[in-house]
Design a protein with these regions (language model features):
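Acidic, proline/glycine-enriched N-terminal capping motif
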Residues: 2-106, 111
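Glutamate identity and glutamate-enriched acidic tracts
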Residues: 1, 48, 54, 132, ...
Length: 175
C-alpha cells in the first residue's frame, strides 16, 4: 500500500453508484482517480496514469482485477446441468465441483450474446457470471425445467486473477 503524500484522496462516489467490497482498499491506488460506471458501480478505469504496465502484466505475468460488477446467477435444481449445457458453448456436464469454465453463449442463430464463467459448486449447483444482464434470457431457456435461477450479483464480490503466471502465483500463495 502506498503511503507517500502524492497519493490522491479516494474518489467520492456519487450516491447513484455502488462500490465494490474492495473499493475502500483499492481506491487510493488509482493514481489518476479516473473512474467509469460499470453496471451501476464505480470502477477504476486504470490504476496508473496509462494502461501500459497493467496491459503488460496481464499479457506476460499476472493481474488481479476487481470484477465485482459482473452479473452473477446461482442456478440449482435437477435440470441445472441440462439448462447450462443448453445455453453455453462448453460441455458443463464434464466440469468437476470447484471447477470454473470460461464460456460464451449464443442466440438461436449462433451469434454470441455474452461470455463469462460457469463455476460448478455441486452436482446440480452452479454460478454463472456475465457482463450483461441475463436473468430473463436464462428463465426463457429454462421453461419446463426443474431449475431455480437466482440473481446474486450484489451478494458477492469477485476478483479475477488473470495472465500466464496466474496459476503459479495462486499456488504459491494458497499452499
Amino acid at each position: 500500500q502506498r503511503t507517500d503524500r502524492s497519493t490522491p484522496p479516494p474518489m467520492r462516489v456519487p450516491h447513484s453508484l455502488k462500490t465494490t467490497p474492495f473499493h475502500a482498499r483499492t481506491a487510493r491506488l488509482v493514481q489518476g482517480q479516473t473512474w467509469r460506471r460499470w453496471s451501476g458501480y464505480a470502477a477504476a478505469s486504470c490504476y496508473e496514469f496509462t494502461h501500459d504496465r497493467e496491459y503488460a502484466a496481464i499479457r506476460s505475468a499476472a493481474a488481479l482485477i476487481d470484477v465485482s460488477p459482473l452479473f452473477k446467477y446461482r442456478i440449482t435444481g435437477a435440470d441445472a446441468t441440462r439448462l447450462l449445457d443448453r445455453v453455453v458453448t462448453r460441455d458443463v456436464s464434464k466440469a468437476r465441483p470447484g471447477q470454473v469454465l470460461y464460456t460464451s453463449w449464443c442466440d438461436g442463430h449462433g451469434k454470441v450474446i455474452d461470455d463469462g464463467t460457469v463455476c460448478r459448486l455441486g452436482e446440480q449447483d452452479y454460478r454463472l457470471t456475465s457482463a450483461e444482464p441475463s436473468l430473463r434470457w436464462l428463465h426463457r431457456n429454462a421453461f419446463g425445467m426443474q431449475v431455480a435461477i437466482e440473481e446474486i450479483s450484489e451478494a458477492l464480490g469477485a476478483l479475477a486473477l488473470q495472465g500466464p503466471t496466474s496459476a503459479r502465483l495462486l499456488a504459491a500463495v494458497s499452499d
